[in-house]
Structure formats: structure tokens, C-alpha cells
Amino acid sequence: ANMNITFKLAEKGPQGEATTGILYHRLESGFGNYYAPRMALYAWDNHKYMNVYVMNDLYGDGVTNNSGVSWYPDIEMTDENLARVVYNGAYIGTNTDENFRRVLTHEFGHFLNLAHTFDDNSGAWPDGCNLNKAGEPNPGDWVEDTPKADQPLMGATDRNCEGDLTNWTNYMNYSYVRTSMFTKGQVDRMLDALDHSARIELWQ
């Protein structure tokens, strides 16, 4: 499904100055952590700008293969200029395979309130794989038209515990193959997220 949303680089900065929307800062890391004190030096007003930080070491721990991270709409994060998407620059464009090039789309999905298709089943689960790690029914991504995935990296012929084929090309899955789509229900959820108090001023 097509949500008809366009993301554009800012043309006007916080003080009204002309900008390309791209700023370069050397040797920064760790903005993938919830609180990153140095981020305050660079953050633009989260009510007016969607901040995307591109770096190689997302968590400041020397690990450079984490692909990306973002957070669901949260007015407290927006008020504190903590709302953001953080993306590993090593995976931009032709630097990597097609699957990792779509990580930014995946993280934008989280920014607009989409969960993974496998919810929190990213590790071991109890007997009865339709249960999550807490032993509760797995809600998938809370979107009715997205088949639940019992775990990440389910493929084209894999079925979930309800017998449904998984939506393996969904952007909110993890996959070693090309992800390429959102369901209509996911699009509706993202459009609803645009009216959240943490996001609405970005487009109004």
C-alpha cells in the first residue's frame, strides 16, 4: 500500500537561514542510546524537524554493524528534542546489499508507530510459538491485515502458528531478501501517527 507521504530535506534552518538540510559533524557516536548528552548540541526543534542522525557507531561501544534505531511517537521525547532516527552510514546506497538499504524505511516505520511483524518474539519463546516471551498471546504488530510472524527472518514459504503465510517482504520484518511493502493497515496506522501530538507539527 502507498501512503503518499513525502520526506524532504529542510530548506530553512531553525533561525530562518537557508540550509541544505544536511550538517556534518566529525567523530560523533552513541546517538542510538536513549539519552545521548551531546545530541543536544545538534538537535533541531523536534516539533518542526524530523531529526535523522547518520553515524557508524550507534551506541558508542565500538560496534559498527548495528543498522538503525528509532522510537515510537512520544510527546516527552519530542519536547526534550530526543525524537529521532539513527542510521548507520555504512548501509547507505551502494555500500551494502539491497536489504540493508531499506533499513531507513524500516526505522521511519517505527518513527510513525509501526512495530515489528514479530512483535517482541526476537528471542526464545515458550512452548506454543503463538505466545510471546512473556507467555502472552503474540499480537504481531497490532495491525489486523499483517500476518503475525513468530520470529524474525521468516521466509517466503514459512507459516506462522496460525497457519498463515508470513508477510516476508514487509518492511517491518527482518529479512535477508528484498523488503518492499507495507500493508494497508500499516499505512492507516502511520497516517494516524501523523496526528499524534509528537508528530503533528512536523507537517501542519
Task: Name each model-derived stretch.
Residues 1, 76-79, 163-164:
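Short, conserved catalytic or adaptor-binding loops enriched in Gly and charged residues
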Residues 92-181:
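The catalytic-center signature of Zn2+-dependent metalloproteases
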